[in-house]
């Protein structure tokens, strides 16, 4: 209750009395971060943490574990189970707030870094291995169907064997964007790779990545990468010649 009162003015907060109740909420609601007490009835914080980290749809969520146990063994256990941060009680409210802000901001910064670059590689610490594999699979499906009229959120849900709401919840939590926005991002990042190769004209890249209008392609590309397609080509040609 103390944390709920101190966070609800800044964030949307969902509370649970124990780990089992929290897990039920997590399976139905999109959550950006979890703060859990280690000691709870029915299912304690460690068990909740383990279930979250072993669930493909939840494992991306940052997890803060609070505990009255001030021992190295307990801290190691929390980190081994996958906690992002282990905080001992009594804690400083300011420290908890700063930790929450930092974890959420780091997630935003990581995806912005990924989205603003042409390639599909992630920085090593941007996300966990399971999340990278999940996103790689989704990205592969989009790239295989870029020129297909059937490319849609429905196609992704079918190929990923997920409900529409589950796909939305996982992707939004992992990247901050909706499935439709991610499809557009993959189109543009693929376009940037093709343009950088120097093997295709802008018009060819436009249609190879599923855009039906050159002007719309140029507008979307400029918004995503901060330069027009022709300037992007020129910059990469200059880089190759100077290298």
List PLM regions with ranges:
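Receiver (REC) domain active-site loop signature in two-component systems and cognate sites
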Residues: 40
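Terminal helix-turn-helix DNA-binding modules in bacterial transcription factors
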Residues: 173-212, 234-243
